[in-house]
């Protein structure tokens, strides 16, 4: 059910976002406690504001009401992915070269399943990161297929 809701929501929201020159970052349909949430994360170059989120929310809500794909009650949330934006697509990695990222792996590489460091390069199949171990800089090459989750990492 969850994947059906996500794919249908993607079909409904994509034309809205294209018209407004916005990017779909992610869609989640999750149950938290006794409530269901349909979360749509959108963005654009330079960031998105609350007015744009509100406009997309209203338009998407109308489309969802028309097609009525969700049987249970739910809350629709449209928002920015935040500063620690998830990296979901290969294009996200391309756009994040030179940025600090956090990567969680399905299986360890060099004894670790988590890396945080600077994304040096991405060739479509391999992520190359530079990270620190104490004061030494090291480099790791991670096959894209082994990445479970990745996101921008903010450092202070």
From Swiss-Prot:
It is found in: Cytoplasm. Coiled coil: none annotated. CDD domains: YlxS_C (cd01734). One of its GO terms (cellular component) is cytosol. Keywords: Cytoplasm, Ribosome biogenesis. Its main location: cytoplasm. GO terms for biological process: ribosomal small subunit assembly; translation. Pfam families: DUF150_C (PF17384), RimP_N (PF02576). Required for maturation of 30S ribosomal subunits. Belongs to the RimP family. This is Ribosome maturation factor RimP. It comes from Oceanobacillus iheyensis (strain DSM 14371 / CIP 107618 / JCM 11309 / KCTC 3954 / HTE831). The gene is rimP.
């Amino acid at each position: 059910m969850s994947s059906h809701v996500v794919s249908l929501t993607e079909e409904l929201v994509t034309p809205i976002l294209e018209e407004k020159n916005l990017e779909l970052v992610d869609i989640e349909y999750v149950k938290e406690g006794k409530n269901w949430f349909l979360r749509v994360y959108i963005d654009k170059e330079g960031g998105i504001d609350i007015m744009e989120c509100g406009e997309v929310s209203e338009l998407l809500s109308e489309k969802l009401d028309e097609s009525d794909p969700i049987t249970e009650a739910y809350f629709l949330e449209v928002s920015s992915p935040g500063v620690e934006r998830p990296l979901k697509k290969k294009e996200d990695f391309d756009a994040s070269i030179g940025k600090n990222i956090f990567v969680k792996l399905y299986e360890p590489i060099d004894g670790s399943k988590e890396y945080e460091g600077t994304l040096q390069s991405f060739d479509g199949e391999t992520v190359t990161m530079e990270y620190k171990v104490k004061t030494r800089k090291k480099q790791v090459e991670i096959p894209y297929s082994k990445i479970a989750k990745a996101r921008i990492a903010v450092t202070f």
